[in-house]
Amino acid sequence: MPGLLLCEPTELYNILNQATKLSRLTDPNYLCLLDVRSKWEYDESHVITALRVKKKNNEYLLPESVDLECVKYCVVYDNNSSTLEILLKDDDDDSDSDGDGKDLVPQAAIEYGRILTRLTHHPVYILKGGYERFSGTYHFLRTQKIIWMPQELDAFQPYPIEIVPGKVFVGNFSQACDPKIQKDLKIKAHVNVSMDTGPFFAGDADKLLHIRIEDSPEAQILPFLRHMCHFIEIHHHLGSVILIFSTQGISRSCAAIIAYLMHSNEQTLQRSWAYVKKCKNNMCPNRGLVSQLLEWEKTILGDSITNIMDPLY
């Protein structure tokens, strides 16, 4: 039986913003997001697409019209759960007390999550810090909307994927040119790994690094990697949030962030690749870029360690 796992706010943010041609939220078997707070709290605001968990005779009801056996991600949140441990709660009724004045009480999200683990094939995630922490960081993903029509989910515009929490995002050219996204994510610097240019970046010489390479296996990204890492580090020290982007946000920009993680953490291509793949499911650098990342690994670690002949790459 699958168990409970804690889900960091950045993980839920990335789950909500996965996309292929359309947002993954269009797939009814992709995400079941459940809010176990009170009705008035839910009505005041909740995370987009979240369903309110109802009670009858003081018992939680299962969500309607959701096949939990088929759902890939089942995420539950309350106000502020931050641990999977059972909490001690003061007991004011001396007659039922065991003498220490406290009872063992699971928080609402954990209590409901345990019920769901009997019905799912995948782990049930408890949002760490609950709604309070998530909405404090990603306020733009709050809503009062309760019912989402299929065409509304089709039209949902995902945000860039968060790679280094609060510091580095990866996206596409369209997202990079969207003023609302720049404002919501507090983007202050850009790394453009494409041939595309636009008026949005005019006059931004100190805040824009443009690596002009084609989307082809012959494109050479290796000569730019050291300068790119230096550019990102400078903006980290300045406290700037950085968006790395390419035309589709799948190949060149992902190769760039993998290279940065290898440099920043002094780690293998394999480890950096796995981390970015977990954050951004449709990541797919072309074979030419993968070969250059192996060369970059040799530069960073003194040897080529990752086997890029593995089908993973």
UniProtKB/Swiss-Prot annotation:
Main location: mitochondrion
Protein name in UniProt: Serine/threonine/tyrosine-interacting-like protein 1
Listed GO CC annotations: mitochondrial matrix; mitochondrion
Subunit: Interacts with G3BP1. Interacts with PTPMT1; the interaction inhibits PTPMT1 catalytic activity.
PANTHER family (UniProt xref): SERINE/THREONINE/TYROSINE-INTERACTING-LIKE PROTEIN 1, SERINE_THREONINE_TYROSINE-INTERACTING-LIKE PROTEIN 1
Organism whose genome encodes this protein: Homo sapiens
Statement: the UniProt record of this protein carries the keyword Aminoacyl-tRNA synthetase: no
Gene name in the database record: STYXL1
One Gene Ontology molecular-function label: protein phosphatase binding
Taxonomy, superkingdom: Eukaryota
Family annotation (Gene3D superfamilies): Protein tyrosine phosphatase superfamily, Rhodanese-like domain
This protein's UniProt keywords: Mitochondrion
